[in-house]
Amino acid sequence: ELLQNSGNPCCDPVTCKPREGEHCISGPCCRNCKFKRAGTVCLDAKGDWMNNYCTGISSDCPRN
């Protein structure tokens, strides 16, 4: 994983964790090393499923 994230500007290549002052490295709720705002759609509705939204405190997309 270290090699995979070595070119990622959000990733500290030594620790493979977010650089100081950054929130995240990747994920559906991460953009430019920061968490997306709460309420940002991270998974569009399909069929009977409703949209899923970012929480503003995680790079993961919570499932409804």
From Swiss-Prot:
Poor inhibitor of platelet aggregation. The disintegrin inhibits the adhesion of cells expressing the RGD-dependent integrin alpha-5/beta-1 (ITGA5/ITGB1) to immobilized fibronectin. Inhibition on alpha-IIb/beta-3 (ITGA2B/ITGB3) is low. It is found in: Secreted. Residues 1-64 form the Disintegrin domain. InterPro entries: Disintegrin_dom (IPR001762), Disintegrin_dom_sf (IPR036436). Its main location: secreted. Expressed by the venom gland. One of its GO terms (molecular function) is toxin activity. PANTHER family: ADAM A DISINTEGRIN AND METALLOPROTEASE DOMAIN, ADAM METALLOPROTEASE. It comes from the Eukaryota. The keyword Nucleotide-binding does not apply. Keywords: Cell adhesion impairing toxin, Disulfide bond, Hemostasis impairing toxin, Platelet aggregation inhibiting toxin, Secreted, Toxin. A motif (Cell attachment site) lies at residues 46-48. Belongs to the venom metalloproteinase (M12B) family. P-II subfamily. P-IIe sub-subfamily. Pfam families: Disintegrin. It comes from Vipera berus berus. Disulfide bonds join C10-C33, C24-C30, C29-C54, C42-C61. Gene3D superfamilies: Disintegrin domain (4.10.70.10). This is Disintegrin VB7B. Negative results: does not show inhibition on alpha-1/beta-1 (ITGA1/ITGB1), alpha-2/beta-1 (ITGA2/ITGB1) and alpha-6/beta-1 (ITGA6/ITGB1). Heterodimer with VB7A; disulfide-linked.
